[in-house]
């Protein structure tokens, strides 16, 4: 063709604009996102993305998988090492798919599961509106302690003993404080129930020793995604120290929920696991320090920050109640207009019907921490947010400040210093910026 189609030009331009905007010009505070290192991105862009490898390493249904087998095995070994586990499966293509495989193994349709209450942050996949519901498993919420913003342990123990569920689920997506795994696991096991922990949001904190390891506190199996506080490619993972239950889940991931498992994730996951092996503790420690400093700064700037009486947060997340400022939908849009990216979120006291315009804003500091920001930068961000939401300044004027602010934080930290050109063979595919 002598002319490039206009649609092709459009696709390239949209990609370029996305990379420029989200990678270099915004303060990204989405709690479920992160950024890979250039090293991980380099191995992510590979021939693996075009290939299939159904089954397990060295037991495939396709030929041509010898390098897939090696890199997948290495990635699982590294993930087990940093998680202090015996068994890992990386074939789930998301945390929700990992949950689906685990739930399918542990209960049949019509049987009961107890989940952490929605007010305490249960993910939609734990509920009747998500994966549990799709599998026909009856979900019952554990009692909620509003003062502690967590599961009510005493009432939960009684419920476990009374209902005798097939399994209980802890972990969540609005997740400021650890759920009581150690306190509830013995009572679950006493009635024959398994304990599932969804670590999607806090997996990087677990591997960085800034959060409790649920498998060391009584959880039987742990699911996760690989792209939140663990800054790898989007994907899922399953971990356990119990061979019998793990084997059943692994045999369910394929062929029940995954055929090909997006092989280009594997080398990038391995690279990220190595980064977290060597730099993860410093990274996780800084995340939690930043979250605490951010919460305190936001409160000082006049925001209503959830959980003040509990120290605001122990995770990467900070949560605002913005009802007095117009509600979550309005404030999230104002922040976006100023290049501060957040998400509106239901708060513990919101009814489910408020999902389109909830009371809250959920924030996460993990990506900005990866770009080298520390406590002082958190205080600067809090001031910018005040200008938009409380002072009522023009978001376009604040946006100029945000873009200028980000110019000093474009390099990914907590990674290896590597000359990528040595490994590219002239075929590296850089980001279009």
UniProtKB/Swiss-Prot annotation:
Plays an important role in substrate specificity, annotated site positions: 227
Pathway: Amino-acid biosynthesis; glycine biosynthesis; glycine from L-serine: step 1/1
Assembly and oligomerization: Homodimer.
Function: Catalyzes the reversible interconversion of serine and glycine with a modified folate serving as the one-carbon carrier. Also exhibits a pteridine-independent aldolase activity toward beta-hydroxyamino acids, producing glycine and aldehydes, via a retro-aldol mechanism.
Organism of origin: Sulfurisphaera tokodaii (strain DSM 16993 / JCM 10545 / NBRC 100140 / 7)
Protein family membership: Belongs to the SHMT family.
Name of the featured protein: Serine hydroxymethyltransferase
PROSITE patterns: SHMT (PS00096)
GO MF, one annotated term: glycine hydroxymethyltransferase activity
Residues bearing PTM N6-(pyridoxal phosphate)lysine: 228
GO cellular component, one term: cytoplasm
Subcellular location: Cytoplasm
Gene3D superfamilies (UniProt xref): Aspartate Aminotransferase, domain 1, Type I PLP-dependent aspartate aminotransferase-like (Major domain)
InterPro entries per UniProt: PyrdxlP-dep_Trfase, PyrdxlP-dep_Trfase_major, PyrdxlP-dep_Trfase_small, Ser_HO-MeTrfase, Ser_HO-MeTrfase-like, Ser_HO-MeTrfase_PLP_BS, SHMT-like_dom
Chain sites annotated for binding (6S)-5,6,7,8-tetrahydrofolate: 122-124, 244
UniProt keyword Secreted present: no
CDD domains, per database record: SHMT
UniProt enzyme class: transferase
Domain of life per record: Archaea
Gene responsible for this protein: glyA
Gene Ontology annotations of biological process type: glycine biosynthetic process from serine; tetrahydrofolate interconversion
Principal location listed in the UniProt entry: cytoplasm
Keywords, alphabetical: Amino-acid biosynthesis, Cytoplasm, One-carbon metabolism, Pyridoxal phosphate, Transferase
UniProt-listed Enzyme Commission number(s): 2.1.2.-
Cofactor(s), by name: pyridoxal 5'-phosphate
């Amino acid at each position: 063709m002598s002319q490039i189609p206009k649609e092709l030009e459009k696709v390239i331009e949209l990609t370029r604009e996305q990379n420029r905007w989200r990678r270099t010009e915004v303060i990204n505070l989405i709690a479920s996102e992160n950024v890979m290192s250039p090293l991980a991105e380099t191995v992510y862009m590979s021939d693996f993305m075009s290939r299939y490898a159904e089954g397990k390493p060295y037991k495939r249904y396709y030929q041509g998988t010898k390098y897939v087998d090696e890199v997948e095995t290495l990635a699982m070994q590294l993930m087990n090492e940093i998680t202090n586990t015996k068994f890992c499966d990386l074939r789930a293509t998301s945390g929700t798919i990992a949950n689906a495989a685990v739930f399918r193994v542990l209960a049949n349709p019509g049987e009961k599961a107890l989940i952490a209450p929605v007010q305490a942050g249960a993910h939609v996949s734990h509920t009747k509106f998500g994966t549990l519901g799709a599998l026909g498993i009856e979900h019952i919420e554990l009692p909620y302690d509003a003062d502690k913003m967590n599961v009510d342990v005493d009432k939960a123990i009684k419920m476990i003993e009374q209902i005798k569920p097939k399994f209980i689920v802890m972990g969540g997506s609005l997740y400021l404080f650890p759920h009581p795994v150690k306190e509830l696991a013995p009572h679950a096991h006493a009635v024959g129930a398994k304990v599932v922990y969804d670590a999607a949001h806090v997996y990087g904190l677990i591997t960085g020793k800034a959060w409790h390891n649920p498998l060391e506190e009584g959880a039987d199996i742990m699911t996760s995604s690989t792209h939140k506080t663990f800054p790898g490619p989007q994907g899922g993972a399953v971990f356990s120290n119990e061979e019998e239950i793990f084997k059943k889940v692994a045999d369910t991931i394929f062929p029940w929920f995954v055929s090909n498992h997006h092989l280009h994730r594997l080398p990038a996951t391995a690279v990220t696991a190595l980064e977290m092996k060597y730099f993860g503790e410093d990274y996780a420690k800084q995340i939690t320090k930043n979250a605490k400093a951010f919460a305190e700064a936001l409160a000082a700037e006049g925001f209503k920050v959830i959980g003040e009486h509990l120290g605001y947060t122990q995770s990467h997340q900070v949560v605002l109640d913005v009802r007095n400022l117009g509600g979550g939908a309005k404030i999230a849009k104002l922040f976006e207009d100023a290049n501060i990216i957040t998400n509106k979120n239901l708060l513990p006291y919101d009814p489910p019907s408020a999902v389109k315009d909830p009371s809250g804003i959920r924030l996460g500091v993990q990506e900005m921490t990866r770009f080298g920001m520390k406590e002082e930068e958190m205080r600067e961000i809090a001031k910018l947010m005040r200008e938009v939401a409380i002072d009522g300044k023009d978001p376009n004027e604040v946006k100029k400040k945000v873009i200028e602010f980000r110019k000093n934080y474009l390099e990914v930290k907590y990674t290896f210093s590597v000359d990528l050109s040595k490994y590219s063979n002239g075929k590296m595919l850089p980001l279009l910026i």
